[in-house]
Amino acid sequence: MGVPMDHDAGAAGQVGQLDWLLDDLVHRVGHVTKAVILSQDGMALGASQTLSRDDAEHLAALAAGFQSLARGAERHFGNGGAVRQTIIEMESGFLLTSAAGSGTCLAVIAEPAADLGLVAYEMAILVRRTGEHIRVNTRASALSGWG
């Protein structure tokens, strides 16, 4: 069982109250084991109960790094648009990240047997339902392409 997160006081809305939605995602979607909402600078804003505080913070930092790399690739090789999603395939499963509200991201860990289409769809639904409630105002958010 995870440890309750101290949520960023600068987050618009009540991010901590979204933890139950992350728990619901983990319990409803087959082979999804962990979920975290994070700020673009890698701060965990909310996490499923399947993550300890340390693991939530570690996953948030990793996911922020991957999103940053993806944005750099889009700026250099693409047309400078927003990064919608990144998927990292590991031997032990997948790490999926998706832009959420302004300055935030949703990251999910899934087992190898996960239906990635379903996981991505459920992530998109969750982002649509919560995106406007999980905005984080950061000094770089306007320049970064998040949200």
Enumerate the predicted regions with their spans.
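Acidic, low-complexity cytosolic segments
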Residues: 2-32, 41-147
